[in-house]
Amino acid sequence: MKSFGFLSFGHYAPAGRRGPSGRDALHQAIELSVAADELGVNGAYFRVHHFANQAAAPMPLLAAVAARTRRIEVGTGVIDLRYENPLHLAEEAAALDQIADGRVALGMSRGAPEIAQRGWEAFGYRAEDPRGADLARANFERFLAAIEGAPMAQAAPLGEQYPTSCAPGTPLRILPHSEGLRQRIWWGSGTTASAQRAARDGVNLMSSTLVLETGQGSFADLQAAQIAAYRRAWKEAGHSWTPRVSVSRSVFPLMSERDRRLYGLAASGDQVGELDQSPTTFGRAYAADPDTLVRQLQQDAAVASADTLLLTIPNQLGVDANLSIIENFARCIAPELGWVPSTRGPQEHDPLLL
């Protein structure tokens, strides 16, 4: 692990209920990101959910964070592509990349089970697959083509153009265009097959907080096997650059009596169940003193395999509580795992060792 950041689910209270409002959650996300940037934390990432009291429109938030910070990477974990116009998303992603000077890590995927029944249809999109997998895949392919500069339209006849700027029939690409943006796109994967496809697509891997598979070994072992399969597929595809891999974990350093009171019962083991009609293994949560956490995370095969760790945080507890979690991890645990703070400059990721 060379880099770590926080992953916020952006929870807020329904209208009329106690707790942070939607406005509070957005402003607190910006404030926490600024504080994390000052600590040298490498990334601020946000999950996206629709029809729920959670973060739903990431681009304005990411742009605000990027404008207020100097080093921290801003990203998503993940954007649900069933809800997206891929060309509009390409425009927004390129503009964000330029605002952030390349400090972007946009995770995307088919999305998770949600509160709405085929909610993407309310946004004007249709899918053959009841879970929308075909829609997400088509949107991802078109998005990747758009950010690479592939023509998406052609210039109108001269009498129909305003202003007149192109010869009729000239191929037109999506603008703005941000060079190298594809290397900052990630696919959120829960299966070995989707991890291998991400490698063939030439995008980074964001391994989920669960795996849609069961088998021998722990959640961490299953996830590490997916990462290994991704890296083998990447090597076979012959891409010319080294990708990144992230995993997400809930980690609560117990530094005080208050920490033990708030998070002491958060520790849990792996769980096996069913999600989205698939056998699923859910990862454990870590809550212990720093020495124990270091030992446990060093033994986590997926954390050891990844270069980036995303700490899932209870954002509804507010800035101070979450900054304490992040700061304690940065001070007492991350250095023992190989962390390189952003204050030391851009990360150079090791070539694949396969």
Each language-model region and where it sits:
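Active-site mouth loops of central-metabolism enzymes
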Residues: 12-27, 79-86, 179-189, 280-291
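Conserved, mostly hydrophobic/aromatic
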Residues: 4, 40, 48, 65, ...
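An alpha-helical appendage that flanks or caps ligand/catalytic pockets
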Residues: 129-174, 207-208, 215-307, 340-353
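Flexible, glycine-rich active-site loops centered on histidine and acidic residues
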Residues: 2-22, 83-154, 213
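Glycine-rich, proline-tolerant flexible connector loops at the mouths of alpha/beta enzymes
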Residues: 43-65, 80, 209-220, 310-323
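Hydrophobic faces of well-ordered beta-strands that scaffold small-molecule active sites
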Residues: 4-8, 44-46, 74-77, 104-108, ...
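Alpha-helix-loop-beta-strand connector modules within alpha/beta enzyme cores
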Residues: 55-79, 327-341
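N-terminal beta1-alpha1-beta2 module of alpha/beta enzyme domains
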Residues: 1-72, 348-353
